[in-house]
């Protein structure tokens, strides 16, 4: 199952899960983001049932980006029960993302 796409108005509801929620903040014009897309979808498959993997287009979520200080992308934020518990900025390695997810389980 690929990562889910969440909108700005559903963000707070999505991150409130008792399961860890990895949010990939990306943009259609961002080449590194495009390269990470398939990896993010792989993580969604590998962690299905354990972690919710979501994507948010930064061009459509200005207030969320401002709230979390997102200025560089790709930007990965990990939430648990609505609280940010991890962050990776401009990460391009699957194993680093997996380590972040594994620590949250």
Task: Label the predicted regions.
Residues 2, 26, 52-54:
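Conserved Rossmann-like nucleotide-binding pocket used by diverse enzymes
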Residues 18-19, 26-29, 72:
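Short pre-active-site segment immediately N-terminal to redox-active cysteine/selenocysteine motifs
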